[in-house]
């Protein structure tokens, strides 16, 4: 998806050093893993949760709940769902009671049915969303307080 293509390897690596990154996606396991590998994003992910194996799909909250359990997430306030699909990614995050960030590089108009917590046009804008102000000066250090 465009989310994985929107960020260079250096930024993916830096982001993975300050946040636990995981993918929640709909589709078939083999196809999605191949796509993630081809995009270069797979190397930076803690885990990948594909609807075929999860017995649920976005926007159902169950797939997000299962992913958070598998990742050992205890505090949902430190979770940010980032996605480019309002009806699946963002609605799924909303359904799961999570903060959401709509990746909207084309500045498309939001029809307003699904309201994300944040909206960004460049994935570099994620840094201030997942890091405390004092952490921004230390990009590159292992600090996994936040999870995307």
Label for each model-derived stretch:
Residues 20-148:
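Asp-based, Mg2+/Mn2+-dependent phosphohydrolase catalytic module
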Residues 12-13, 90:
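Short amphipathic alpha-helical segments and helix-helix/interface helices
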Residues 14-18:
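A short, Lys/Arg-enriched amphipathic alpha-helix followed by its capping loop at the start of a domain
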Residues 1-11:
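Single conserved hydrophobic/aromatic residue that forms the stacking wall/gate
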């Amino acid at each position: 998806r465009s989310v994985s293509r929107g960020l260079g390897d250096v930024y993916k690596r830096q982001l993975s050093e300050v946040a636990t990154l995981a993918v929640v996606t709909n589709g078939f396991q083999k196809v999605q893993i191949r796509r993630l590998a081809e995009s270069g994003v797979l190397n930076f992910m803690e885990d990948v949760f594909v609807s075929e194996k999860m017995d649920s799909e976005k926007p159902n909250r169950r797939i997000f709940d299962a992913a958070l359990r598998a990742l050992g997430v205890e505090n949902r306030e430190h979770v940010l769902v980032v996605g480019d699909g309002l009806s699946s990614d963002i609605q799924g995050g909303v359904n799961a009671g999570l903060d959401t960030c709509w990746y909207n590089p084309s500045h498309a108009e939001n029809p307003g049915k699904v309201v994300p917590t944040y909206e960004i046009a460049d994935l570099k804008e994620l840094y201030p969303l997942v890091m405390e102000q004092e952490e921004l000066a230390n990009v590159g250090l292992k600090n996994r307080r936040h999870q995307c």
